[in-house]
Amino acid sequence: MSLMLEPNPTQIKEERIYAEMGLTDEEFAMVERILGRLPNYTETGLFSVMWSEHCSYKNSKPVLRKFPTTGERVLQGPGEGAGIVDIGDNQAVVFKMESHNHPSAIEPYQGAATGVGGIIRDVFSMGARPVALLNSLRFGELQSPRVKYLFEEVVAGIAGYGNCIGIPTVGGEVQFDPCYEGNPLVNAMCVGLINHEDIKKGQAHGAGNTVMYVGASTGRDGIHGATFASEELSESSEAKRPAVQVGDPFMEKLLIEACLELIQSDALVGIQDMGAAGLTSSSAEMASKAGMGIEMYLDDVPQRETGMTPYEMMLSESQERMLIVVKKGREQEIVDLFEKYGLAAVTMGKVTEDKMLRLFHKGEKVAEVPADALAEEAPIYHKPSKEAAYFAEFQAMKMETPKVENYKEALFALLQQPTIASKEWVYDQYDYQVRTSTVVTPGSDAAVVRVRGTEKGLAMTTDCNSRYIYLDPEMGGKIAVAEAARNIVCSGGEPLAITDCLNFGNPEKPEIFWQIEKSVDGMSEACRTLQTPVIGGNVSMYNERSGEAVYPTPTVGMVGLVHDLKHVTTQEFKQAGDLVYVIGETKAEFGGSELQKMIHGKIFGQSPSIDLDVELKRQKQVLEAIQAGLVQSAHDVAEGGLAVAISESAIGAKGLGATVKLDGEATAALFAESQSRFVITVKRENKEAFEKAVEAIQVGEVTSTNEVTIHNEENEVLLTANVDEMRKAWKGAIPCLLK
């Protein structure tokens, strides 16, 4: 739409054009009050994106305030591009997770690729070098052709971007459930390393300093992407393909190197990624955080399409762009630096004292809005919350153990459930060894990356069992954080902090808002108990298709510190003769389990329960035993229960099996999903020391028979399974479904 054709302020109000942009009547009246006049078309656009849920968290802020966000190692909590945690020796780890769900539902390859690009920019805008990527993905059932297409394209998009940019994709998770059929979830996480003195903020300080635009040119892609992410998907969403941005990983690789060099220069004052809402959010937020204003001349914006209006330039979400503030008079140094990398750096404005965001185009002032009004003054809504109708019904159910006729067949069937099955088809497409720092590659409980020049490593994982959270949001929220920490501990790491990606349905529905509140309550309690503060994250609402919401999926991304790489521990058995231990008791807990879903085709009842104090005690014992060199392998017991965990530890080894004896009712002993459990192997000579340090029960030993045999307490054989056959079934399941 050219400037001549844009509706005037009166038309915007009378024809309710603001509503098409996502503003409510009350919000438009607020804008009118703030400005003391009717906004023009560009100004209406600025408010509509900055006040969208995606940018303002207006529906979720009251809930997010419950998260613990401070700790002795936390250097930067929520509010900047990414959170930062101290790891000693003047170094820190920077990490964040974000969603790109809606774009990936419409245009899966580019949606996923640009999700990766955006989260990388959040990390290097803090001054950190990105060292690892993870992703957490949710899809419908793989039997559906549409789901196959989305799955293949999303994985290809992540691989295409990550591999080209040269950052290893080292871990993550993929789960499949019918509720994600129309609305897949694509959550990307980036981890970076930084020295304390290099930390940069996205703030525009110093009146008279220069505002510069660096990186790729601006096109019409992604206009209103933030607003698109703040509404439910529908049949008409397909028409919004233009709202999906297109990424160029080679451009981003140059941008990373240029920005990391720039950060070493004292000419730089502030830097921020142009992410959701593009130029609007970066300029308004940088000005607002510094208590300043910004004036910008939009004719100077590098444009790759002709005739772009101020509205289009401000709302474009073209990729690979950064906004920087530099000291006045030092502009040429910056231009020269970026030119060396073949990138544009142009002066397009200046910092002012009057706290206004002022835009000029073709010699005319086209917008004048208080920066704080855009960045900080979105209305905050305390949404009505109502316990979901199904919850009381599920809580009251008398749970019966699912009937299993043949334990071996059940184990093989579980190993082929796509959520449990090997994800090798996925991660074989990722370059997880680039930078040659990956110590533990995908497929174990957590990935581990070396901190170069030290003996330290970073352990990292993403976790969330959304079935448990659907059944019991508070309990499930606790479990998500606890499982992430358990995975870090099993890898030899001390859990440090989390980033979260809260994926939910429409928060305007009281039952959905109840899920959000309760799961955040559970996560917050677990973060406090396990001492893993929340240092940043992302909220993705409106994950619905035709009124059907996805399961509540508050994904947890956690990073831990491996104090010495010799402590790195993996899940596979190491040698015959080692003793097998189980930590934690097994109860007949099947609500939301893989066995329940496999047998009944649906989930119901109560989720497994968790006692966070017990969880913490066990994690501390396991970590201390690992650090004392007493542990050969460690694996957390998750989906599929003990039989699956023991089988996975055998599958990962070569030519090893195990003979174990499990007490209690057979189906529960094998397949229940009780929490706070570990499978640990220990050298025979360390038996006494280990048993003194850890409350564990010896259940058997690792054998060289290449078979897993499980007995009951009467010594009757419940199942014997050949490890090669299990490996073949486990590895072949996803490729087979994709054929």
From Swiss-Prot:
Which HAMAP family does UniProt cross-reference here? Answer: PurL_2
Q: What does this protein do?
A: Part of the phosphoribosylformylglycinamidine synthase complex involved in the purines biosynthetic pathway. Catalyzes the ATP-dependent conversion of formylglycinamide ribonucleotide (FGAR) and glutamine to yield formylglycinamidine ribonucleotide (FGAM) and glutamate. The FGAM synthase complex is composed of three subunits. PurQ produces an ammonia molecule by converting glutamine to glutamate. PurL transfers the ammonia molecule to FGAR to form FGAM in an ATP-dependent manner.
Record's protein name? Phosphoribosylformylglycinamidine synthase subunit PurL
**UniProt binding sites for Mg(2+) 1:** 98, 538
Could you say which protein family the record assigns here?
Answer: Belongs to the FGAMS family.
Q: Which SUPFAM superfamilies match?
A: PurM C-terminal domain-like, PurM N-terminal domain-like
Keyword terms of this UniProt record: ATP-binding, Cytoplasm, Ligase, Magnesium, Metal-binding, Nucleotide-binding, Purine biosynthesis
The record's catalysed reaction(s) read: N(2)-formyl-N(1)-(5-phospho-beta-D-ribosyl)glycinamide + L-glutamine + ATP + H2O = 2-formamido-N(1)-(5-O-phospho-beta-D-ribosyl)acetamidine + L-glutamate + ADP + phosphate + H(+)
Record organism = Bacillus cereus (strain G9842)
Task: Report the GO molecular function annotations.
Answer: ATP binding; magnesium ion binding; phosphoribosylformylglycinamidine synthase activity
Catalytic activity, EC: 6.3.5.3
| Location(s), subcellular | Cytoplasm
Query: What's the name of its gene?
Result: purL
Q: Write down the Gene3D superfamilies for this protein, in alphabetical order.
A: PurM-like C-terminal domain, PurM-like, N-terminal domain
GO cellular component, as recorded: cytoplasm
Task: State the source organism's domain of life.
Answer: Bacteria
> Where is this chain primarily localised?
cytoplasm
List of residues binding ATP: 57, 96, 500, 537
Positions binding substrate in this chain are: 99-102, 121, 245, 317-319, 540
Quaternary state and partners of this protein?
Monomer. Part of the FGAM synthase complex composed of 1 PurL, 1 PurQ and 2 PurS subunits.
Catalytic residues?
54, 100 (proton acceptor)
